[in-house]
Amino acid sequence: MKISMRIVGVSAIALALCGCGGSEKKAAEYSPKGADGAALAVGFNQKQIKAVQERLLGEKAKEVSSSLMKNAPEEVSDVIKKAGLEDAEVRWGVVTVGEPKLKEDMDLDGVPEVMVAVSLDIDIEKVVAAFREQLKKEAGEELKETTVAGVKAWIASDKDLEKQKVSPTFTALDGKLFLAASTTASLEKLVALYRDGKGQSAAFSSFGLPADLLLRLVLTDIGARVKKSIPKPEETLKIVSQFVPNGDKMILALGALDFSATSAKDGGVALKLTLKTGSEKDADQLRTLAKTGLMPFTAQMKEAAKEDAESKVYAELLEALKIAGTEGVFEANLAVPQAVLKSLAENQLK
């Protein structure tokens, strides 16, 4: 049985995320800063901004961009002062959301995808505490409406996706605060829209989003959905008890299951699954079952790795998986390097 980490059919993937900063010459580009920084980001990358400006009315688009750049500092400073965060380093840029089908005769009043994005280098806890309500009051609804409009325009190119629901949300991820838009369409379907003529994916460059960050989004989404979709104890008790002694106690403890995906110092991601079983005996038994159960899969993947590069990656991940925990708590930890994340992302898109 081959273990595959390819992610298919995952819904509610957050879109419209990219970092921002720079000056009038250099608009939004995302750059991970680690857990000690924070960013409010809406928009896409520099190439898309230039493309939209060119497709709009040339000089008029530049005039609007210059106006936004000129006025942004004062507006941002005002919000900073109201939030009591005068020491925050602020950068801004003109960005676009989505890839709307623009007609040559369309004026800027009909294009809500041009806006100002702001990057704040401050502690995420301060951002969440001081800015969340402020953002909702000052610009929340406007940004949400614009983001949704951009995403809807983007998915309108596919009849199936056109029917999918789109909803905006404020999201804290990897030490950053984002305004995101999510859709019920599958990751596979979304990625398919961004394949170029040679079958190679342009998804990450089009998103302006690093592969490792996209994978963290997906993994976090999976963890949340696994936790939410755990069956009620009475529905699965009989099945579990056939394989695990004292399974009734363990299944009742599944409500304490927690999954997290956080940024690692090397640019990778640290995955952690924690389950409070209620007793050290049950936790120890679960650790034993996990370790012995993984052994044959690891051996099989090692064998397959001799001829398959993808299997080699999975074999290394299985070996890196650490089963731990004490005092009635079961833990499974996996540190995935940045290079492996990118490799997995590339395999997902083939």
Predicted segments, located by residue:
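Short, conserved charged micro-motifs
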Residues: 51, 122-129, 280-288, 341
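Long, low-complexity, Ser/Thr/Gly/Pro-rich intrinsically disordered segments that act as flexible linkers
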Residues: 23-150, 263, 329
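C-terminal motif of bacterial Sec signal peptides marking the signal peptidase cleavage site
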Residues: 16-19
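One face of beta-strands
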Residues: 38-42, 114-120, 215, 253-261, ...
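Bacterial N-terminal signal peptides that target proteins for export
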Residues: 1-9
